[in-house]
């Protein structure tokens, strides 16, 4: 189901408790893909994550990488100012993933109390927002390493929010390929 309305900010809030497997701490990441009319990245600069923390005009900002969870209610945030999104960006995809050691079998089921909350705010200075979607990663996506949680689609001068809940067993690398990014 989708909904259309005028909102200033979308706040993507990834949370988890410190969790271990074989004495390794889990690191989760939230990211955003700013997509063109073909549903692809027009440039790798439109992939916002821990190594590229801001879009060109600061319309999308990744606030910092928490490497182990359990520090606060807001472990990792991406803040999207919809009023600043360039016109060539037709949709924004919100992703949660496990930052993993290559070859290891770490899945969301191993990470206690992991969730992704999506909130909206009508005031660009109010980061508390009103939650309208929550994904329980541990329970809903136990056998996955990454998910596309939400797609925000431009509809004229407004935005439409479409929950996706699409899982990827091989992690973020598969999502980057899915959106045409370079690895």
Question: Where are the regions that the model predicts?
Answer:
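Intrinsic-disorder/low-complexity signal
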Residues: 1-183
